Amino acid sequence: MEFVKCLGHPEEFYNLLRFQMGGRRKVIPKMDQDSLSSSLKTCYKYLNQTSRSFAAVIQALDGEMRHAVCIFYLVLRALDTLEDDMTISIERKVPLLHNFHSYLYEPDWRFTESKEKDRQVLEDFPTISLEFRNLAEKYQTVIVDVCQKMGFGMAEFLDKRVTSEREWDKYCHYVAGLVGIGLSRLFPASELEDPLIGEDTERANSMGLFLQKTNIIRDYLEDQREGREFWPQETWSKYVKKLGDFAKPENIDLAVQCLNELITNTLHHIPDVITYLSRLRNQSIFNFCAIPQVMAIATLAACYNNQQVFKGVVKIRKGQAVTLMMDATNMPAVKAIIHQYMEEIYHRIPNSDPCSTKTQQIISTIRTQNLPNCQLVSRSHYSPIYLSFVMLLAALSWQYLSTLSQVTEDYVQTGEH
């Protein structure tokens, strides 16, 4: 199936080959775990089990930053698992969320009653908290602070809906913006980045909001089936009486109009994303931050004006994901990627769309940030004849490609709420 999808995109097929035959290690080097303690090895095992996509880029981080971000992720994954567990009553869940940050200093605390798929991070929380306490104090301080704020924020939204767009921003701040702020404080604490990265919380928050809003938009149908609602009522109530009505065929035109309005809202974070990424100096941190952002940008472009959001799953091609991972390793390339997908959206804006003018305006604003009007070198350097020849040779060994690393599948399919 991936071979068929790549026929119209020969550069993606070529990049699939390069990725499998060594290109992956240039972007995501393999981590040596031989020198790790048994408890830290267990933490990395949980990291790979709960999110292979984030595990790949986390394990590619330099120095002690790698362990700090690994533990940060697992702590927040445990907190998120508590929040998501619908079998726990709100009366019991609220104090758990409020006090969760304190459990990091209780060596024996664990929670064994969760029914969620990632419950192992709660059941074996003593292993995670042990490695947390082994971190330098400068990292512990950041993780505890973010964990406390996130726990209180999650508790606030347990029994209330996202009403306004302002509330949407607030919810996304609690569950994702705080992650961006926390990471941005960890980076300079490691001395791998300048203090400004951690001081500019507005742009760090935008990094998280952009990813979270993209996931919420894409996952409309899945969330509806699970009884969850994250689209802001202020927006969708202009089109239908109930959010679930968008899934009805007779409402598809209204559904797409609302979709386009939310995507336009989300595009407003891209200028902050560009500014944030342009300040990064460490290569491993740049890759860690840039890859999820360009994946989200490609996903938004795939969702824009697309009825499929309300009918099934919208995801980018595996070859497209691999190409983005291999290209997004420097700022000029990231700018070119953003330019490409902004143009895709711009040329698909319906004249009849109520939000068309606003969409055009934000894309024009993004264009002013020195986005190059050109293709990426890796996508235009090779001639069509050369690419076709490569495809012919590659087709003979397609079975080999079927074992392509699961990391690319996760980047395409995994939405982390």
UniProtKB/Swiss-Prot annotation:
NADP(+) binds at R52, R77, R218, K315, R317. It catalyses: 2 (2E,6E)-farnesyl diphosphate + NADPH + H(+) = squalene + 2 diphosphate + NADP(+); 2 (2E,6E)-farnesyl diphosphate + NADH + H(+) = squalene + 2 diphosphate + NAD(+); presqualene diphosphate + NADH + H(+) = squalene + diphosphate + NAD(+); presqualene diphosphate + NADPH + H(+) = squalene + diphosphate + NADP(+). One of its GO terms (cellular component) is endoplasmic reticulum membrane. It is a multi-pass membrane protein. Pathway: Terpene metabolism; lanosterol biosynthesis; lanosterol from farnesyl diphosphate: step 1/3. SUPFAM superfamilies: Terpenoid synthases. Pfam families: SQS_PSY (PF00494). Signal peptide: none annotated. GO terms for biological process: cholesterol biosynthetic process; farnesyl diphosphate metabolic process; isoprenoid biosynthetic process. This is Squalene synthase. It comes from Bos taurus (Bovine).
